[in-house]
Structure formats: structure tokens, C-alpha cells
């Protein structure tokens, strides 16, 4: 990424141990639908002050210019900014740093990781009072806490999710003769934990641990089969699964039938639900593995009206990976200058190298 973080998720348990030693009650809270609910007009409020920005709406203010650019990215909508780009991460920090600033006089103990808050207090009353002030500070920027994830609990509490701690502690030694048995036990437990914690990304975590291994472990098809199962059940695990499988492209190319079935099934399942990330990763994997896309797979992707997925299809056509290249002819309609300001502006912007 172009923008990094000072702390990774792996560092959270040790940081929690440090600040939780300073109180008896823990306030946990996060912002509901954070990126989709960001009000673009609040960007100049955060950069220049709310009162000043409301009195000065011209482009001479950087915040107003960013506000307009964000609206142009979202079909003119004032609610929501794109999820994923580093620019959005930076804008999120600009907003929530101002929220932090409004609370700084209270000398709070704890941390904020993106939009997740964990703060400690000596008494429950202090925690509830701080919760009220946090809600008030967020409301100034049109943001709200998620009531289902906001709570005050007595300390001590677990430093990390029990399922994550268990999977992290399981031994996996790729160079050992015991590795095959370790692998079976690891994924058996991961599948069991995924059923016990259906709202958590258990299989994504399991696949991610495999992807971080430095030694090539795919001498055995079983490892690949287990990873494919993870992606079939939890499509969010697909990037980590692909990172593992594509580490050995020659081996991946020998299992094209299995991978084609996986990727096509993910596209067919998630395209009608407009799950852009899952579909985009699947199409990208087809490009990387040179797997052809049938009309049956392409049609629901076009109906998503998603520029990133459409551009990936155009790249597939350029590589000769579409069974029917004419399936994409309808994208020619998005070539007018006006389309640069509509919801599919990215497709229009990139039209020349792909459509002409």
C-alpha cells in the first residue's frame, strides 16, 4: 500500500495488555457502516473547521475540492466514499483524528484502530459518560456508533478472539515429516471454528496463515484442495488462497479444472449480489491463470454495472480469454464525455486502451 499503519493487527493483543492494565472497565465501540456513511461535506469540516468551511464553500479550500472529487467518484452522492483505496484510508484518518482531538481533553486511555475504539476507565459511570461524549463528537461529522457492537464490560477480557488465538498456536512446520498431519488437524479445527463463529473471518485467517509461509508447501495436492474449500465457503478468503496457490504457477496450471470451477462458481454466486471484491478477484485470477470465461459467467458481471469488473473483462477479451468477445460490445455505450461524471466514470476514463 502507498500508506502504511504504525500498528498492525498482530500488535493489538500486546497493546491491549498494556492499556487495559490501567482500568477496570472497557468501552468497546465502532462506527456503523463507516466508509459507506461518511458524509463528503464533512471532509472540509475536518480540514478547516465546521463553521469556517460552511461559510467558505469555494474551491480555494482543499477540503471543498476533495469533497467534490469524492462525490464525482460516487455518482454525485454525498454519502459514502470508495472502500479500499489508500485515499479513503487517509480521509478516514483525517475525520477520526478530529474526533480524537475533541476527546483529547478527557485524557482517555486506550486505542482506536481505524473506526474501532477500545477505551478503559476506573468506573462504569466514567465509561458511560465517555461513550456519550464519543457519540456527540462523531455526530458533529454525521457519524454514528454501531449499537450492536458498542458495550461497556468489566476487565479483564480476552486480548484476542479465542478462535484466532487457537489457530495461531497450532504448529505448522512445512519442512517436517509431520506436516501432513499438522495440516489436516489445522484445517479440521479451522472448519469447526468457522461453524462455531459464522460471523467471523475464520477461514480467511486460516488461508492467510498459509499464505505467509515462506517455504513452498504445495508438493501435496491436499493443501491446495483445503485452500480451495476455504474459498468456496468464505469468498473473502480468496485473495489469501490465490496468494498461496499462485506462488507456484506451474503447479497451479496443472489444476486448471479445479480452479476454473472455483472461480466461475464464485462469480456466478456473487455477481447477482453485486459483491464487487469477490467478483473482481475471481476475474483477476482467471487472467493470471489464463482461464477462459464463458458467456454464462460474463453476463451477470455486466449486469453488476461495476467499472472495475468491466475493465477486467475487457482485459480478458484483449488476452483472448472470452468465449464470445462480442458479449462486451454493450460497453461501447459508456464512451461519451458525460459518462466521466456518472457512476461508471472509471470505465469511461479507461476506454481508449481497452475499447478502441
Each predicted region: which residue ranges?
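Extended, Lys/Arg-enriched charged tracts that mediate electrostatic binding to polyanionic substrates
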Residues: 1-7
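Catalytic-core helical/loop segments in enzymes performing group transfer/polymerization on anionic/lipid-linked
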Residues: 9-11
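Conserved polymerase palm-domain catalytic core
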Residues: 14-114, 119-135, 141-143, 171, ...
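Conserved catalytic core of two-metal-ion nucleotidyltransferases
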Residues: 84, 141-172
Amino acid at each position: 500500500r502507498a500508506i502504511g499503519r504504525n500498528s498492525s493487527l498482530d500488535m493489538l493483543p500486546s497493546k491491549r495488555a498494556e492499556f487495559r492494565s490501567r482500568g477496570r472497565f472497557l468501552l468497546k465501540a465502532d462506527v456503523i457502516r463507516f466508509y459507506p456513511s461518511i458524509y463528503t461535506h464533512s471532509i472540509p469540516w475536518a480540514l478547516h473547521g465546521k463553521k469556517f468551511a460552511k461559510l467558505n464553500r469555494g474551491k480555494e479550500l482543499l477540503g471543498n475540492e476533495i469533497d467534490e472529487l469524492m462525490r464525482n467518484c460516487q455518482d454525485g452522492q454525498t454519502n459514502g466514499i470508495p472502500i479500499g483505496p489508500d485515499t479513503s484510508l487517509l480521509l478516514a484518518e483525517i475525520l477520526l483524528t478530529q474526533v480524537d482531538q475533541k476527546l483529547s481533553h478527557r485524557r482517555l486511555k486506550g486505542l482506536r484502530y481505524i473506526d474501532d475504539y477500545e477505551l478503559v476507565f476506573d468506573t462504569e459511570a466514567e465509561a458511560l459518560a465517555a461513550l456519550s461524549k464519543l457519540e456527540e463528537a462523531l455526530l458533529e461529522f454525521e457519524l454514528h456508533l454501531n449499537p450492536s457492537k458498542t458495550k461497556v464490560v468489566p476487565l479483564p477480557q480476552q486480548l484476542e478472539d479465542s478462535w484466532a488465538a487457537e489457530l495461531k498456536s497450532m504448529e505448522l512446520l512445512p519442512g517436517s515429516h509431520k506436516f501432513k498431519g499438522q495440516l489436516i488437524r489445522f484445517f479440521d479445527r479451522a472448519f469447526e471454528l468457522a461453524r462455531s463463529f459464522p460471523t467471523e473471518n475464520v477461514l480467511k485467517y486460516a488461508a492467510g496463515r498459509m499464505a505467509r509461509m515462506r517455504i513452498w508447501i504445495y508438493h501435496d495436492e491436499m493443501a491446495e484442495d483445503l485452500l480451495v474449500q476455504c474459498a468456496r465457503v468464505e469468498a473473502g478468503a480468496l485473495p489469501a488462497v490465490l496468494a498461496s496457490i499462485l506462488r507456484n504457477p506451474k503447479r497451479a496450471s496443472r489444476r486448471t479444472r479445479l480452479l476454473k470451477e472455483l472461480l466461475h462458481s464464485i462469480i456466478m454466486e456473487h455477481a447477482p449480489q453485486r459483491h464487487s471484491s469477490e467478483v473482481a478477484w475471481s476475474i483477476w485470477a482467471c487472467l493470471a491463470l489464463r482461464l477462459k470465461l464463458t458467456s454464462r459467467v460474463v453476463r451477470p458481471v455486466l449486469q453488476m454495472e461495476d467499472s472495475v469488473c468491466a475493465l477486467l473483462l475487457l482485459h480478458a477479451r484483449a488476452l483472448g480469454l472470452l468465449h464470445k468477445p462480442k458479449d462486451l460490445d454493450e460497453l461501447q455505450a459508456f464512451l461519451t464525455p458525460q459518462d466521466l461524471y456518472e457512476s461508471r466514470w472509471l470505465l469511461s476514463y479507461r476506454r481508449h486502451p481497452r475499447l478502441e
